[in-house]
Curated annotation (Swiss-Prot):
SUPFAM superfamilies in alphabetical order: 2Fe-2S ferredoxin-like
Name of the protein this chain belongs to: NAD-reducing hydrogenase HoxS subunit gamma
CDD domains with a match to the protein in the record: fer2
Source species: Cupriavidus necator (strain ATCC 17699 / DSM 428 / KCTC 22496 / NCIMB 10442 / H16 / Stanier 337) (Ralstonia eutropha)
Gene: hoxU
Catalytic activities: H2 + NAD(+) = NADH + H(+)
């Protein structure tokens, strides 16, 4: 059913029940995301897509549009909130962009540029997390993980449907885990899918590195904003 909603004072016509992030993008309004993937079940873990819906802060990827919805995206308070959330993620992990293999292809890095982050306002933690290289095909850089849970939910063993990745422990001790036995059975295309689905440089394919020349990397060719507005990258 066609309905009308308002985004930043502009009245739009869309279909009831669609995801707010997608509706906004189709109407030229960019809302940054890190855990959301178009046409996949919503995770709502990163909160980087926070907006106001009828006066209340909500994660846009979790909101299904309905008649009369009033959405604020570019309010200064919200813009700073989203920037702060990105800064938190940079401060919590070890994101050394110049030396990271994912630089230029990293969604966190690209979103950082979009929210005008230069340096985090929060003290950096520099956590020490053990690298997991038990798998024959995947190198797991735990200290870069932002716990978006994309890999946990969407990368599964082809035969059994079991999860290949998981998160163990709680709070500051949380860390990403990999089932080496299941990972060793992953076909090459699924390994590449796992690397691509990770928004940072946590999941890396062994024996493949720095194969995209500077100037030809994903977000150098087209920004994360442009990709999102075209529905190609969330």
């Amino acid at each position: 059913m066609s309905i009308q909603i308002t985004i930043d004072g502009k009245t739009l016509t869309t279909e009831e029940g669609r995801t707010l992030v997608d509706v906004a993008a189709e109407n030229g309004v960019y809302i940054p995301t890190l855990c959301y993937l178009k046409d996949k079940p919503c995770l709502g873990t990163c909160r980087v897509c926070s907006v106001k819906v009828n006066g209340n802060v909500a994660a846009a990827c979790t909101v299904r549009v309905s008649k009369g919805l009033n959405v604020e995206v570019n309010d200064p308070e919200l813009v700073d909130m989203r920037k702060a959330l990105v800064e938190f993620l940079f401060a919590e992990g070890n994101h050394n962009c110049p030396s990271c293999e994912k630089s230029g292809r990293c969604q966190l890095q690209a979103v950082g540029y979009e929210v005008d982050m230069m340096v985090s306002r929060f003290p950096y933690r520099f956590p020490v997390r053990v690298v997991d290289h038990a798998s024959e095909k995947i190198w797991l850089e735990r200290d870069r993980c932002i716990f978006c849970q994309r890999c946990v939910e969407f990368i599964r063993d082809k035969a059994s449907g079991r999860k290949i990745f998981s998160i163990s422990h709680r709070g500051p001790e949380s860390r990403i885990e990999i089932d080496a036995e299941l990972a060793n059975a992953m076909p090459p295309e699924q390994v590449k899918e796992a690397v691509a689905i990770c928004p940072v440089g946590t999941i890396l394919e062994k024996r493949v590195g720095y194969d995209d020349p500077i100037g030809r990397r994903k977000y150098e060719i087209q920004s994360v904003r442009a990709r999102a507005l075209e529905g190609e990258d969330k």
